[in-house]
Amino acid sequence: MNIGILAVDSNSPNLALMKISAYHKARGDQVEWYNPLCKYDKVYAAKVFTFTSDYNYYINANQIEKGGTGYDIEKVLPIEVDRLQPDYSIYNIDSNLSYGFLTRGCPNRCKWWVVPKKEGKISPYMDIEEITAGRKKAILMDNNILASNYGFSK
């Protein structure tokens, strides 16, 4: 399959897109950043924020999958994709750097904060060794890591 990935509203590395890329590459699929001049079997569009504009141009693909909190707070990656090591090669980042979450969720119920609605109460998610997988540095993307004994102990 020919797969396109599209980060609609984020300049930061998108962990979900990196995991989707890893999943498809492991299956032997061709994965690249979406190019409007190319035709794809499937394009994954990721949108982080609800208040940012959507990609309002034609997407040349047989199938389009939109995901991320900006589109649907209830949609999540399938577990077999979510637990994969991300494909860091799609971004120009340090080869010793990893991204991930030790915990998911949030203990607070702020009206404006989507995380408790999307992920529930704070809970352990991954071990640091799962995140780094031999890399020397990690950027932890947790929303409230110090609110968890698990996150605090790591």
Predicted regions and their residues:
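Conserved Radical SAM active-site core
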Residues: 1, 40-42, 52, 98-104, ...
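Glycine-rich beta-strand-to-loop/alpha-helix junction loops that act as flexible
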Residues: 46-47, 65-71, 142-143
